[in-house]
């Protein structure tokens, strides 16, 4: 009985070991699989078991290896059968080239060394310039100064806007005091504010009603905003955003509000911000304007620098400006880029308009400028300048409607001329009738062409803020504090001090847009001495 049971167990053990990869026993097969060697065989990798030496070397069983190609696509089982027993000395053991042995629970294992790839950081880009370092540092400093100067110019432009608004607020209070009976009952000297009020009344009479004409006021506002803007954006576009700012009652100055303040995201449908930023008027400096200077030689208009005769083209309009020093400038108008104000950087002129010339021979002139609004006196001043320089005015057309000259007949051109002429004539007649009795009692103003407003701007860059000096000192100080340009503001205070509140806007009357001082800024008309 015992013999039969032993035979059964031996047979079962043999079956199990044979099915389990033909190893003698599972424990030995497990240990043998932990130790293996790789050797190159016919372009492939052959994995063979490196068996441990058992006590009975005569008992050998077939060994199994796994042959795999380098691509690992197909694996093949290779069975090696030993026909003869091998002695311990004759047994060949395949080992790696440099095995590293490590003791782990009494077993010898091969150590596989894995080399980690070295990650090399990218080489930093070194800016190379042929210019010396000192020159590069100077360029960086210049760039910082340019940005800082632009920021300062914007603050100064805002100062001009603020002092103009504050002036209207003070002027309304002065006008209210002047209209009261108590003002005349008290014996006191007339203040500077009251003189400003009387100056406004006088300016409205001698200026053909400019302060009461809405059309002229709008054009004057456009001229002013364009002149003081550091970028000289087209005044026609600026004044639409100026109206939005006035209605918003914002406590921020206009240009700060427009560029980086609460209004930086305002985009009007009919006047988009992209057009506002694109259309910037070029203001010429003293050297730049020399290229547009025109002289008269033998009765013909000739460019002084290039000595070429003036020729008007059909697809553009030739514009001219006569400076206060009686220097003539002629150029081609480009809407939103180059216009009458470009020649003298927005400064005052004697005459302005358009002309047509062929080979230097003057054929037509027209006193039209939506920027300067020239009057008949300005036109006569220009004609006298031409006659003094021996220009034959016999065949020169002096009207705006003429079929022979396409420059005067383009669509919208005659329409603008008609509107401007009506805007100039209508208020003039009205004011003469209203103030007729008062004019009889006062002395008639005397025109003096030699004395003009202080609007001589030579530089083509920067805002035109000289008009701020003409305001009372108290308003100047308050305006500087409003835009944080006053040294009296503490460093810890905010940019816009709250005690002053919003800038007084909109103005008292929708028809009054700018003060008389700014209304006449740059307009080429004879000035009068206002005796306050």
From Swiss-Prot:
- Record keywords: Cytoplasm included? yes
Listed GO CC annotations: chloroplast; nucleus
Q: Name one GO biological process term.
A: response to salt stress
InterPro entries named in the record:
IQM
| Predominant location category | cytoplasm
Extent of Basic and acidic residues compositional bias: 56-66
Composition bias of kind Pro residues appears in: 499-509
Q: Which GO terms describe its molecular function?
A: calmodulin binding
What tissues harbor this protein?
Expressed in roots, cauline leaves and flowers, and at lower levels in rosette leaves, stems and siliques.
Alphabetically sorted, this entry's keywords are:
Cytoplasm, Nucleus
Compositional bias annotation for Acidic residues? 85-94
Domain (IQ) spans: 136-165
Tell where it localizes.
Cytoplasm; Nucleus
* Chain segments carrying region Disordered: 47-67, 85-104, 410-443, 487-513
State what induces this protein: By hydrogen peroxide. Induced by light. Down-regulated by salt stress and treatment with mannitol.
Q: Where is the composition biased (Polar residues)?
A: 487-496
Q: What is the documented function of this protein?
A: May be involved in biotic and abiotic stress responses.
Under the heading PANTHER family, the entry gives: IQ DOMAIN-CONTAINING PROTEIN IQM3, IQ DOMAIN-CONTAINING PROTEIN IQM4
Write the protein's name: IQ domain-containing protein IQM4
């Amino acid at each position: 009985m015992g013999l039969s049971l032993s035979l059964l167990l031996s047979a079962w053990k043999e079956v199990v070991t044979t099915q389990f990869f033909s190893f003698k026993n599972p424990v030995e097969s497990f240990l043998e699989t932990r130790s293996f060697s790789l050797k190159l065989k016919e372009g492939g990798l052959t994995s063979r078991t490196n068996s441990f030496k058992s006590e009975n070397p005569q008992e050998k069983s077939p060994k199994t290896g796994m042959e795999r190609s380098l691509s690992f696509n197909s694996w093949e089982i290779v069975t090696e059968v030993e026909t003869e027993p091998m002695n311990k000395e004759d047994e060949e053991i395949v080992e790696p080239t440099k095995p590293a042995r490590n003791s782990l629970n009494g077993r010898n294992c091969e150590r596989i060394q894995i080399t980690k790839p070295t990650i090399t950081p990218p080489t930093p880009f070194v800016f190379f310039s042929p210019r010396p370092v000192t020159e590069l540092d100077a360029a960086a400093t210049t760039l910082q100064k340019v940005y800082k100067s632009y920021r300062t110019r914007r603050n100064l432009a805002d100062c001009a806007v603020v002092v103009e608004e504050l002036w209207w607020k003070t002027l309304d209070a002065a006008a209210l005091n002047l209209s009261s009976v108590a003002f005349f009952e008290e014996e006191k000297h007339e203040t500077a504010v009251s003189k400003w009020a009387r100056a406004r009344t006088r300016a409205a009479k001698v200026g053909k009603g400019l302060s009461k004409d809405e059309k002229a006021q709008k054009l004057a506002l456009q001229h002013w905003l364009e002149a003081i803007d550091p970028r000289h954006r087209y005044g026609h576009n600026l004044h639409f955003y100026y109206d939005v700012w006035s209605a918003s009652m914002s406590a921020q100055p206009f240009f700060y509000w427009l560029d980086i303040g609460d209004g930086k995201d305002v985009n009007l449908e009919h006047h988009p911000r992209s057009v506002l930023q694109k259309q910037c008027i070029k203001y010429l400096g003293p050297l730049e304007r020399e290229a547009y200077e025109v002289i008269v030689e033998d009765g013909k208009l000739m460019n002084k620098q290039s000595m070429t005769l003036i020729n008007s083209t059909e697809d553009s309009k030739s514009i001219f400006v006569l400076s206060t020093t009686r220097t003539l400038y002629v150029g081609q108008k480009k809407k939103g880029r180059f216009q009458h104000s470009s020649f003298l950087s927005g400064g005052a002129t004697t005459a302005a308009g358009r002309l047509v010339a062929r080979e230097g021979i003057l054929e037509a002139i027209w006193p039209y400028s939506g920027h300067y609004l020239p009057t008949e006196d300005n036109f006569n001043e220009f004609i006298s300048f031409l006659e003094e320089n021996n220009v034959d005015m016999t065949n020169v057309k002096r009207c705006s409607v003429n079929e022979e000259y396409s420059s005067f007949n383009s669509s919208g051109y005659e329409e603008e001329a008609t509107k401007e002429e009506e805007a100039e004539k209508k208020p003039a007649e009205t004011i003469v009738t209203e103030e007729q009795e008062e004019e009889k009692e006062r002395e008639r103003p005397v025109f003096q062409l030699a004395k003009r407003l202080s609007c001589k701007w030579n530089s083509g860059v920067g805002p035109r803020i000289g008009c701020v000096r003409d305001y009372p000192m108290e308003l100047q100080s308050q305006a500087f504090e409003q835009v944080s340009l006053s040294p009296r503001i503490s460093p810890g205070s905010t940019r816009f001090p709250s005690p002053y509140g919003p800038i007084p806007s909109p103005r008292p009357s929708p028809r009054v847009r700018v003060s008389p001082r700014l209304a006449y800024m740059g307009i080429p008309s004879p000035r009068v001495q206002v005796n306050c």
